[in-house]
Amino acid sequence: MNKRSLIVVLLTLSSLLLCSPTVTHAQWEPDVRLTVAPDSSCTGYNNAWSIAASGDSVHVVWFDKRDGDGEIYYKASTDRGTTWTADTRLTNDMAFSGWPAIHLSGLQINVAWEDQRELNPEIFYMRSTNGGATWEPFSRLSYAYGVSTSPCLSMTDSIVHVVWSDDRSGNSEIWYRRSLDGGAYWEPDTSLTNAPGNSEFPSIGVSGTNLHVAWADYRQGNTAEIYYKRSTDRGTTWGPDIRLTNYDSVNSYYPSLAVRDSDVHIVWRNDQRRLGIYYIRSTDGGDSWSPASRITDTLGYTFRPSIAVLGSNVHLVWMDDRLNCNPYFDIYYKCSTNRGNLWGPDTRLTYDPSFSWYPSIAVSGTKVHVVWTDHRDGNYEVYYKRNPTGNPSSIEEKAEALGQRVDVMHKLVPNPFVSFATIPGHHSELFILYDISGHRVGTYRGERIGEGLKAGVYFLRAEGGGAKPVRIVKVR
């Protein structure tokens, strides 16, 4: 066996060990209560995310009723979840605002939610372009005069993409809207489905120019199936609806979708054998799909899966009542370190005899971050938990660290730059910038390197080390 083959074997074994029940349980830190409110605080639906993370920063959104009707709130951590800012109220009206979704791209934070200030529920949007320090005024995205709900959003290359479901046509359909300038101006909305049954709970992921959407659909009759469609031109045109499940007599519902390069991962709840979490993936950008498989190991009820991916690692959380404490649920977790080929065992994250609902997951560097809604304090509050070493580096990344490195930073364009630069093919990866004295100035995704910096000379390297730093210049 040559040296490189031995390295790969050892790294494979170490990655699998990191997802073993003993190791993963030991690495998870204690639960942290994020909200202290006199009324209910709640995270959002699982088709979207209530938490986002990049580098040292972690961002959380939720809604709560401390002010009466329900408002959207936000808070952040700049030290990887160790300490947290005070709550920031994002909405202020006399009607219900709830079920928020968040997405992070560099220093820009995008939030969408369901809002009833126009009497019927509509989709609203708000952004921060400076990491949450300040927030711009809201934008109304839907004008359905029916029920618009369950938004999910993503962003890449200054394009913000939002999907949701609304019933303006008589039954719920999936709608899409995009902004080409980072959320300042929005193009008209577009219906992605036109089916005889309801289409609900869309989940969107973006990789480069490719958009991927999954949702639950009742067009086949009284039971829901998981459907998928994609755009390969940033949302300008869309391919056909593709049915991914075929269970007929049982529901497939509550999908959650994550994308990494050409890998598309989808999980959902299935009613077969009570309620299990099922998984399907495509490794060619949606051209073909693996068989669907059940990946939870329980006869209890499982709901609301949330999925995240970074490198070769796929992470999953869900709510679970396998301990027969119905109606109480616990939050469970599992991961795959090889792009979804094999999955580690189920890991229990919460141990309080109360309701733990609506989990959401994010990954940054080696850290896995989870938030959920919890009733242990007598009313619903938002709780947080992290695993500081829960995202092991991929085999490829570790092999590069041992000598087989690829210096992708030399592809950065333009250089010098005025606003920001990009690294083609590495838009979602994280890179660290240092000033000329060697001080770290920030972490950026490959799609918006250097945004918000003053003019000057900087040095760029991939998060986690590896390739030699690259000199970059920002002008004006």
Question: Model-found features: residue ranges?
Answer:
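Bacterial N-terminal signal peptides
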Residues: 9-20
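Composition-driven detection of intrinsically disordered, low-complexity segments
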Residues: 8-9, 246, 386, 402-405
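Local alpha-helix boundary/kink/capping signal
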Residues: 18, 83, 134, 420-422
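Bacterial N-terminal signal peptides that target proteins for export
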Residues: 1-10
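Extracellular, repeat-based ectodomains that mediate carbohydrate processing or recognition
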Residues: 25-392
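C-terminal outer-membrane/trafficking sorting elements
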Residues: 398-476
